[in-house]
A protein has these predicted regions:
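N-terminal nucleotide-binding beta1-loop-alpha1 segment
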Residues: 28-29
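Active-site-adjacent betaalpha module
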Residues: 1-24, 33-34, 51, 60-68, ...
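Short glycine-enriched, charge-decorated loop/helix-capping segments at active-site entrances
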Residues: 40-50
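A short, glycine/acidic-enriched catalytic loop
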Residues: 37
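Glycine-rich, aromatic-flanked loop segments that form ligand/cofactor-binding clefts
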Residues: 25, 74-76
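Short catalytic/ligand-binding loop motif for oxyanion handling, primarily in non-cytosolic enzymes
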Residues: 80-84
Length: 225
């Protein structure tokens, strides 16, 4: 693959011009507590199969991306063990019997260093791939993601992960405000709620692509050869 070329990728609202040398794969919050049976997501009554369907498309895209030596960055949502970075408003949000920092099936919920906070084995980062530990929904707020991307000369992002309407959408909007072009493969992002999945993707591509482009991972993989 000639990474200096521009590759038109089928997308909505119109084709996305992929520039591989300037594009990073940003995988959002594919964490055990969100995706695995018995984790925090399931404890809240959610159907984790809605998220688990994204694992295989992400695995295939990640393998193809790595094969070309392109930039990969992962994120995890979570907090310091002392919870000093956890706003009270976030702690009580949802009014669940179990809150962030409480004991869960895979350690303390959304606390850095705990089993449930870590990324699922199927997509586990290589030692050379930065992992952004973020305390909020967006991957740019209170992190060094923007600086890392600038240092790598990145101007485009392929954004995958969970959940579509929360952390993926928030990150895409943050990226858009910072001048990054974002492509979201619909099969590589997921929501516990099908209606939120649909609307989350519609919002990204609305009004001529106000926040970015929406397509399918197969279109990306077709050029990663």
């Amino acid at each position: 693959m000639d990474t200096s070329r521009i590759f038109p990728i089928a997308a909505e609202p119109y084709a996305f011009d992929l520039k591989p040398a300037q594009c990073a794969l940003l995988i959002i919050d594919m964490q055990r507590d969100f995706l695995e049976p018995g984790g925090f997501g399931e404890m809240l009554g959610n159907d984790v199969s809605q998220l688990r369907r994204t694992i295989e498309p992400n695995r295939l895209l990640l393998a193809a991306w790595r094969m070309q030596g392109l930039a990969v960055i992962h994120t995890r949502e979570g907090h310091r063990p002392d919870l000093a970075d956890l706003p009270p408003a976030k702690k009580i949000r949802g009014r669940s019997a179990t809150c962030i920092g409480d004991a869960g099936p895979m350690g303390r919920i959304l606390v850095r260093g705990e089993e449930g906070h870590d990324i699922i084995p199927e997509l586990y980062p290589l030692a050379t791939e930065p992992v952004i530990d973020k305390p909020g929904k967006g991957a740019f707020w209170a992190t060094d993601l923007h600086g890392i991307l600038q240092n790598k000369g990145i101007t485009q992002l392929v954004v995958t992960g969970v959940t579509t309407e929360v952390c993926v959408n928030t990150t895409v909007r943050e990226a858009n405000d910072r001048g990054y072009d974002c492509f979201v493969p619909s099969d590589c992002v997921g929501s516990y709620f099908p209606e939120f999945q649909e609307m989350g993707l519609k919002m990204i591509k609305a009004q001529g692509g106000i926040f970015g482009w929406v397509g399918h991972s197969s279109s990306l993989r077709a050029v990663l050869v």
